[in-house]
C-alpha cells in the first residue's frame, strides 16, 4: 500500500475492481467531471515516468496500481498515441478488448514496457492495461494540440510480482550508471611525456690532472677551453651545447722564437748563474725564477 493512509477505508478493504467497474464507476465519472466516492486512483502523467517509479506515486496498491493519465498524440494531426515513457516505451500486445455490453463503453488495451530506444528496447515484465472511452471524437480539436485524451485509466503491475529492479538498458539510458564507468587514462606522449620525464643528464667528467709542467705545455692550448657562462637558473650543467669563450695559452712556437733570440740554452749555466750572465742577458734575472728553471731544464733535453 502506498499513500493509503490518506484514505478513510474500512477494515479488510481490498481494491480489486472488474473491467466494467473500472469503466462505469471511475473512468466515465472522471471524464464527465463527476465526483468519485473514494478518490483512490491518483492522477499523474504516466508517460513521464518508468513503470518501476509508479508504485510510490499511487494512492493505493500492493501488487497492482491504478492511475488516471492524459494521453498525447505522436504527431499533431495524427491519431496515433505517443507511447514513449521515461527511459523506454510502451508497446501494444494482443488485440483490443471491448468493455461493456451490449454496446462497448470503453476499449481495453494491453501494453508491455521496453527499456531503451525503439525498436531495439529490452522487454521487461511490466504490464499496463489501458482503458479508454469508445466512440469519442479524437480529431484535433485545437490547432497544434497534441492532446488525444484528457483521461485514460491505467492498471500497472509486474507479472513476476512485487517491485522489480530496472533493467540494465534502462539504467544506461537514464544515465544513472555509466557502463564501464572507469576512466581510462592514456599514456602521455609528445611534449607532455618530455616534461614528465626529463632527459638523462650525463655527469661532467673532469680531465686528467697534469702534475708535470712540461706535459701541460706540450698540450695544444685550444684543447683546454675555459667556460664563462652566467645563468639565472638554479642548476647549471656543463654540456657541449653551451657556447664557450676560450682563452688561449702561449703556444710552444712562441717559446721557441723567444729562446731563439738569445742563442743556445745552457740549463746548468742558468742555474749556477742566478744573475743571468749565462747567456740570458736579455732576460735579466728571470733565470732565478723556479718556473723558468723548469722550462729551461725541459728544453735542454734532447728530442
From Swiss-Prot:
Under the heading Pfam families, the entry gives: NAM
Where on the tree of life does the source sit, at the highest rank? Eukaryota
Q: Does the keyword Transcription apply?
A: yes
Q: Which SUPFAM superfamilies match?
A: NAC domain (SSF101941)
Tissue localization of expression is: Widely expressed.
- GO BP annotation list: positive regulation of DNA-templated transcription; positive regulation of response to salt stress; positive regulation of response to water deprivation; regulation of defense response to fungus; response to cold; root development
| One GO cellular component term noted in the UniProt record for this chain | nucleus
Q: What is known of its domains?
A: The NAC domain includes a DNA binding domain and a dimerization domain.
What is the protein named? NAC domain-containing protein 48
Q: Quick one: which gene encodes this?
A: NAC048
